[in-house]
């Protein structure tokens, strides 16, 4: 635990900090609300992230959580220019290795001098549960140093917060504690709350955290993801059904939520367009049973138009990622928020109804 793994010698430091610490006082916290633009259309439009907020990426196995996190590091961390901390908690060693080498290739990590602005902390799948339980707290402590000592706006990426809970469950079993629901540790809510309360914005700086959350068997009522829900400002839910349609990122536009989706924060235009998009998608969802039984021909002309627009909107929410260029062969795109709002506004107005569905993939 605490050893460098990149074969570049010992870490030279004079300052040490305990990984268990108290959350900041209420008086030191900042309450300003500001949107963090990611360049990912479906996120910025329908469930925007708050600067200094806690964001959860929910999804089952192989729906694209880690790829989305890597794209956020690529888009936000580079544009934002501040410090980033990545805590790899109980995930695949290969993914951690890939991320490290990609950061070197893209210049986020500079091996020649001290200009790098990212810290990587790993406790991968093969590590004992004690190491996996501590690595999330270690990453958080590093982020707190950048916020409190250097006054930075820090981005903290945790992949995967479920493994933090899982490691706590294993440690609890080794200690002989009586398990709670579904075999989790009896201190599940306390463990999660103690960590999450430290991730906040103070008057010195901010920590914006993006946490990938594995959902066991795609069950959002499982105690581990359900306990995490209470602490989040925004949730991005990745859907297997959308991934099966070949739409990536496979973000569910109806299940994903954000606390700052408020006209007083994002503005009336953004709010109205987002709610208009969600209304069409919800109407389409409610018509799907009728379509399955009776077919499209039995729908009214108005419903046919709703279905047509909804299918086009679904495809327009897709986007090629820069970090996935090697797999898809398509160049990644970063879309400004103004362009996103304008594009969907024109779609809702029917300006592009004459175009076929295929035209809506970027």
Curated annotation (Swiss-Prot):
Which residues are Mg(2+) 1-binding? 66
PANTHER family tied to this protein: ATP SYNTHASE, ATP SYNTHASE SUBUNIT BETA, MITOCHONDRIAL
Stated name of the protein: ATP synthase F(1) complex catalytic subunit beta, mitochondrial
Q: What does this protein do?
A: Catalytic subunit beta, of the mitochondrial membrane ATP synthase complex (F(1)F(0) ATP synthase or Complex V) that produces ATP from ADP in the presence of a proton gradient across the membrane which is generated by electron transport complexes of the respiratory chain. ATP synthase complex consist of a soluble F(1) head domain - the catalytic core - and a membrane F(1) domain - the membrane proton channel. These two domains are linked by a central stalk rotating inside the F(1) region and a stationary peripheral stalk.
Family, according to the entry, reads as follows:
Belongs to the ATPase alpha/beta chains family.
* Species of the source: Mesocricetus auratus (Golden hamster)
> Which CDD domains does UniProt cross-reference here?
ATP-synt_F1_beta_C, F1-ATPase_beta_CD
Gene label: ATP5F1B
Write down which residues bear the modification named N6-acetyllysine.
14, 51, 112, 117, 279, 333, 338
Q: Does the keyword Translocase apply?
A: yes
């Amino acid at each position: 635990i605490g050893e460098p793994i990149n074969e570049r010698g010992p870490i030279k430091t004079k300052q040490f900090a305990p990984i268990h610490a108290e959350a900041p006082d209420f008086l030191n916290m900042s309450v300003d609300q500001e949107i963090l633009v990611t360049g990912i259309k479906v996120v910025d439009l329908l469930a925007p992230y708050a600067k200094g907020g806690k964001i959860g990426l929910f999804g089952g196995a192989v729906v694209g959580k880690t790829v989305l996190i890597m794209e956020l590091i690529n888009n936000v961390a580079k544009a934002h220019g501040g410090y980033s901390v990545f805590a790899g908690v109980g995930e695949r060693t290969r993914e951690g290795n890939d991320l490290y080498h990609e950061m070197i290739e893209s210049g986020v990590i500079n091996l020649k001098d001290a200009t790098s602005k990212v810290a990587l902390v790993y406790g991968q799948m093969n590590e004992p549960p004690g190491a996996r339980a501590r690595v999330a707290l270690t990453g958080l402590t590093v982020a707190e140093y950048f916020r409190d000592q250097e006054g930075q706006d820090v981005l903290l990426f945790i992949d995967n917060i479920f493994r933090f809970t899982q490691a706590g469950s294993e440690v609890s079993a080794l200690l002989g504690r009586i398990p709670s629901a579904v075999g989790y540790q009896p201190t599940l809510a306390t463990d999660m709350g103690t960590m999450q309360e430290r991730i906040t914005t103070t008057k010195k700086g901010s920590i914006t955290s993006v946490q990938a959350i594995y959902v066991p068997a795609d069950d959002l009522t499982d105690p581990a993801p359900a306990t995490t829900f209470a602490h989040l400002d925004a949730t991005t839910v990745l859907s297997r059904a959308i991934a099966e349609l070949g739409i990536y990122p496979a973000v569910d536009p109806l299940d994903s939520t954000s606390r700052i989706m408020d006209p007083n924060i994002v503005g009336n235009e953004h709010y109205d367009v987002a709610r208009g998009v969600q209304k069409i998608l919800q109407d389409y969802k409610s018509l799907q049973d009728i379509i399955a039984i009776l077919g499209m021909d039995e729908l009214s002309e108005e419903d046919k138009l709703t279905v047509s627009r909804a299918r086009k909107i679904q495809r327009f929410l897709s986007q090629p990622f820069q970090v996935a260029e090697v797999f898809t062969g398509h160049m990644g795109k970063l879309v400004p928020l103004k362009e996103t709002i304008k594009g969907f506004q024109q779609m809702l107005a029917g300006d592009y109804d004459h175009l076929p569905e295929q035209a809506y993939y970027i």
